[in-house]
């Protein structure tokens, strides 16, 4: 299994941002979800955390919900997401205050357990997107083409937690090599995902 992708350069990240904005209008929904989530957490919105996360899931992960072997986005699915957020609320609140640079070996059991629970409900791509929007400085993003670009092949729901932990370690190394948030600000994980998305998902780089 290959886990190496060349560490991106500043020029590549900047070019990816330009291409991403040209080719991906759905970024609007990411920004809306982030804003809605922050206002919900601050008690400034009538929407719930689940509804804020749903903005991302129903736009960036919509293919998950049209497959025959995955759940519909119905009342039961919303209740399942509510349950995830309730059960893992304390852990998510703690991770929301951290950056991926702070990732430690002793985070592994909690991160893997958290991801496994989300994976079983949302699939491996939806799990990463939901966790990222809930703690955007800490949880790394991926999709299947991006993972496959690194030689990583995602499995069925509930089988990907260790792969995601390894992805977190790999992304932390990338962030540190790039200079971290001190160089790029708090949106560095999103910038890396934009480069991966342009390179492996829509292949415009």
Residue spans of the language-model regions?
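Short hydrophobic alpha-helical segments that form membrane-spanning helices or hydrophobic packing faces
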Residues: 127-133
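An N-terminal alpha-helical hairpin/helix-loop-helix interaction module that forms a charged
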Residues: 1-118, 136-205
């Amino acid at each position: 299994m290959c886990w190496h992708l060349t560490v991106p350069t500043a020029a590549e990240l900047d070019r990816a941002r330009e291409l991403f904005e040209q080719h991906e209008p759905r970024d609007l929904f990411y920004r809306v979800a982030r804003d809605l989530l922050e206002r919900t957490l601050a008690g400034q919105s009538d929407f719930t955390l689940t509804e804020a996360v749903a903005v991302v899931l129903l736009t960036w992960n919509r293919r998950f919900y049209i497959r025959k072997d995955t759940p519909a986005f119905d009342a039961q699915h919303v209740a399942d997401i509510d349950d995830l957020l309730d059960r893992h609320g304390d852990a998510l609140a703690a991770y929301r205050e951290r950056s991926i640079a702070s990732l430690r070996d002793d985070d592994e059991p909690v991160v893997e357990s958290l991801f496994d629970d989300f994976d079983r409900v949302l699939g491996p791509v939806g799990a990463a997107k939901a966790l990222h929007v809930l703690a955007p400085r800490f949880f790394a993003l991926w999709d299947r083409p991006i993972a496959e670009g690194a030689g990583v092949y995602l499995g069925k729901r509930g089988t990907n937690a260790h792969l995601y932990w390894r992805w977190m370690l790999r992304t932390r190394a990338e962030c540190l090599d790039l200079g971290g948030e001190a160089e790029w600000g708090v949106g560095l994980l999103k910038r890396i995902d934009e480069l991966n998305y342009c390179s492996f998902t829509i292949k415009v780089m």
